[in-house]
From Swiss-Prot:
GO terms for molecular function: deaminase activity. InterPro entries: RidA, RidA_CS, RutC-like_sf, YjgF/YER057c/UK114. PROSITE patterns: UPF0076. Belongs to the RutC family. This is Protein DfrA. It comes from the Bacteria. GO terms for cellular component: cytosol. Pfam families: Ribonuc_L-PSP.
Length: 131
């Protein structure tokens, strides 16, 4: 698997990241893969994972990991994510889970509070990966 050239961008003239994400990520664009938003569905049962937002975020990240793998990619290829939360009070707990999946400079990211998500999910995450 070829590693893409990627550079985390930081400007002291903009606010520092308040979570596990980069202000920007610059890549030498190769093949782009757009991952649809994942919610905490167990792929074996297609039922929602039981538990709090931490359990849901863990399942969401594992679902993203599976889709990345099916594309021949991993989290090191992700350059952009959007996190949708039904309660921004869950921001720190979701960050803890999310941050464990990125070993290098994390991707650029936005987090948005929404009024509802499919099947009553508390969290949904989509991603863009480049190889």
């Amino acid at each position: 698997m070829r590693r893409m050239a990627r550079k985390a961008i930081h400007s002291d003239q903009a606010p520092k990241a308040i979570g596990p994400y980069s202000q920007a990520v610059q890549v030498d664009a190769g093949k782009m893969t757009f991952l649809s938003g994942q919610i905490p569905l167990d792929p074996a049962t297609m039922e929602m994972v039981q538990g709090d937002v931490v359990a849901q975020a863990e399942r969401v990240m594992e679902n993203l990991k599976a889709v990345l793998a099916a594309s021949g990619l991993d989290f090191s290829h992700v350059v952009r994510c959007t996190i949708f939360l039904t309660d921004l009070g869950d921001f720190a707990r979701v960050n803890e889970v999310y941050g464990r999946y990125f070993t290098g400079a994390p991707p650029a990211r936005a987090t948005v509070q929404v009024s509802a998500l499919p099947r009553g999910s508390k969290v949904e995450i989509d991603a863009i990966a480049v190889s």
